[in-house]
Amino acid sequence: MPIDFTLNDNQRRLRREARQFAKDVLSGVPVATRDLPSPIERFVATRPFYERLVAEGFLRKCIPVSVGGDCAGLVDLAILAEEFYTVDANVSLTMLSTVLGLAPLVVGGKPEQHQRFLPPFLAAKGAPLAAFASTEPGGSANVGSLPPGEGVRTTARRFGDSWVISGRKQWISAATGWNGQGADLLTVVCRTDANVEPSRGISIIAVPRPDSGLIFEHAFDMLGHRAHLTPRFRLDAVQVPAGNLLGQEGGGLQLAAESFAGSGALVGIFGVALMRAAFQFALSFAKSEKRGGIQQIIQHQAVGYALADAKTTIEAARVLSWHACRALDTAAPGALELAIHAKVFGSEAAVRVITNLMQVVGVDSYGHELPLAGLLQDAVALPLFAGGNIGVRRRQLHALMLDPAYDDLATLDGVCLAETAFSNGE
């Protein structure tokens, strides 16, 4: 794989269009949501922005060309995600969570399933939502745990030509939809055979919004991403056709691994976006503010060095994430390991860099009149979601290194160990 991150004409156009849309449209999200008291109200208030995003074709730009969308690869998705997330993390996360919700369908679905479930997401109208329903109350870092560990507790039982699904899920982005009755499509991780080990007993099933049985329980009032919804809900004997099984029965852990692989690299980009927004503000502040002195504070070496360190980290995190995206796009050796590194590095760097930039600005950065406090609140989530860095991501890296066949140069020219990395995690 050539080491070349030069953007082609289409990618430069995508970046330009996404940046303009974020500036013109997504910049209005904070004003529309900040004074609303509940997470549900704030989330619902983002719907017009999301509808505009869909209407202008940006959701299509996140869905692979191979299934009818306009996305040529994860690098393109990373470019789009950075431009959106830099301006507003809320609607951006709703869009990208929908993409994750579709991932098991895109990766493991049959052509007939693509034709049944994807049209609403390709139509460039409305406000379609999808959600990957994996996490459960009590945590899901050990979804593949052997007894006596509980692992996945949501069950799907086969009755004739149907699956009947029961269980509880939480922290699933936009899973209960705009009105509490469900997203347009859920891809549900569930136990289809309790009598075999998880690697053969967990599956993923597509669940269109049911007429009954999806019961909203709670909306988390989060520290950051204040206008994004991550509810807890229950599936109470929800019945779907047997043909909604995605991939092979019992192949859910591997399908989840393949679906989640790209999310790691993209969370790294989320970190880049938040750092970029913080850096741009802090740089402008340092060039314009004297803070009672006789010269702009950027003239002070401590301030200049702090800004330089921040920019170095941003560039490093972006290149690592792009490298992971390109490796995943081309199924290059070591792609999964790169994606995990991108997630861990980018997410943790965001918290550290934004905190350091707040020190450049001073105590005023602690108030919400300036953007840095809100950016830090958003950044704190990144090491925790899409596979927590401690409970899941570092454990995946640990599993790679424990394998006798592990090659530390696999990210250059070694053997891809994706199956091993996910054998005991998401």
Which role fits each region the language model picked out?
Residues 1-93, 120, 404-406, 410-426:
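Amphipathic, small/basic residue-rich leader segments at the start of a protein or domain
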Residues 3-10, 14, 215-315, 425:
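Glycine-rich beta->alpha junctions and the first turn(s) of the following alpha-helix
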Residues 30-40, 287-295, 311-345, 354-366:
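C-terminal helix-coil-helix/basic helical segment that borders enzyme active sites and/or dimer interfaces
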Residues 80, 361-426:
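Glycine-rich phosphate/cofactor-binding loops in nucleotide/flavin-utilizing enzymes
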Residues 126-140, 189:
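A short, Trp-centered hydrophobic/proline-enriched beta-strand micro-motif
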Residues 168-214:
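A short core secondary-structure module
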